Amino acid sequence: MAGKKPSHRAFKVADQIQRDLTQLLARLKDPRLGLVTLQGVEISPDYAHAKVFFSLLTGTPEQTQAALDQAAGFLRNGLFKRLQIHTVPTLHFVFDRSCERAADMNALIAKAVSTRAKED
């Protein structure tokens, strides 16, 4: 069943998990956590696992991932209290490098535009 599209309910649950995790993260006092932004959540069809994609404004990805992994039990417990589903997924945090790649692409485009302007 590889490639099966997630159901509408799975999207709704993933969205709710993202909103609830954002609120729960605000309560964490771990100094290793910088300014974390949750970019999205992908949930498995059986709701057993959730990949939580995050990006950073401050801090290092390694330290932040370690802090999030350590807080995963607390966060899952918080989700258990908030969600109205039978199985609360195990949380797997993944650093989302798409923001970094977008910034790199913007820098390359700006460099190309300035080089072309100098040639003209």
From Swiss-Prot:
What Gene Ontology terms describe what this protein does at the molecular function level? ribosomal small subunit binding
User: Is Cytoplasm there in the keyword field?
Assistant: yes
> Which keywords appear in this protein's UniProt record, sorted alphabetically?
Cytoplasm, Ribosome biogenesis
A Pfam family of this chain: RBFA
What domain of life is recorded for the organism? Bacteria
One Gene Ontology cellular component annotation held by this UniProt entry: cytosol
Identify the stretch annotated as signal peptide in this record: none
Where does it reside? Answer: Cytoplasm
What's a BP term from Gene Ontology annotated to this protein? maturation of SSU-rRNA
InterPro entries, A to Z: KH_dom-like_a/b (IPR015946), RbfA (IPR000238), RbfA_dom_sf (IPR023799)
Give a yes or no for keyword DNA repair in this entry.
Answer: no
> What SUPFAM superfamilies has UniProt attached to this entry?
Ribosome-binding factor A, RbfA
Annotated PANTHER family: RIBOSOME-BINDING FACTOR A, CHLOROPLASTIC-RELATED
Q: What does this protein do?
A: One of several proteins that assist in the late maturation steps of the functional core of the 30S ribosomal subunit. Associates with free 30S ribosomal subunits (but not with 30S subunits that are part of 70S ribosomes or polysomes). Required for efficient processing of 16S rRNA. May interact with the 5'-terminal helix region of 16S rRNA.
Quaternary structure, per UniProt, is: Monomer. Binds 30S ribosomal subunits, but not 50S ribosomal subunits or 70S ribosomes.
Tell me which family the UniProt entry assigns to this protein.
Answer: Belongs to the RbfA family.
Q: What is this protein called?
A: Ribosome-binding factor A
What's the source species for this entry? Answer: Verminephrobacter eiseniae (strain EF01-2)
Q: What is the lineage of its organism?
A: Bacteria, Pseudomonadati, Pseudomonadota, Betaproteobacteria, Burkholderiales
